[in-house]
Design a protein with these regions (language model features):
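Extracytoplasmic electron-transfer domains, predominantly the class I c-type cytochrome c fold
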Residues: 13, 19-88
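Electrostatic cytochrome c docking/interface patches
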Residues: 1-8
């Protein structure tokens, strides 16, 4: 779907997801749904937190290397968040 394509194009170069991408420059997201927090503990890993993280991670954790996603529509970021919430081992 659209979320998987966005992940592949925009996230998979840095992030690994088992069976999807092999990025190794940023955290492995294969088990993201099982983690209590995002950004090394700076925000809760729940539906709202994940959407905030995808939309505004630069403000939440200053100096983070992950690029901004201003060019990705909010609806698509929401779909990406929904997909990421399913990732568990």
């Amino acid at each position: 779907g659209a979320a998987g394509q966005v992940f592949d194009e925009r996230c998979g170069q840095c992030h690994r997801v088992a069976g999807v991408s092999d990025g190794n420059r940023a955290p492995d997201l294969s088990d993201l749904a099982t983690r209590p927090t995002l950004g090394a503990g700076v925000i809760a890993n729940d539906a709202e937190g994940l959407r905030r993280w995808l939309s505004d991670h630069q403000s939440i954790k200053h100096g983070i290397a992950m690029p901004r996603h201003d060019d990705i529509p909010e609806e698509t970021l929401g779909q990406l968040a929904d997909w990421l919430e399913t990732l568990a081992p």
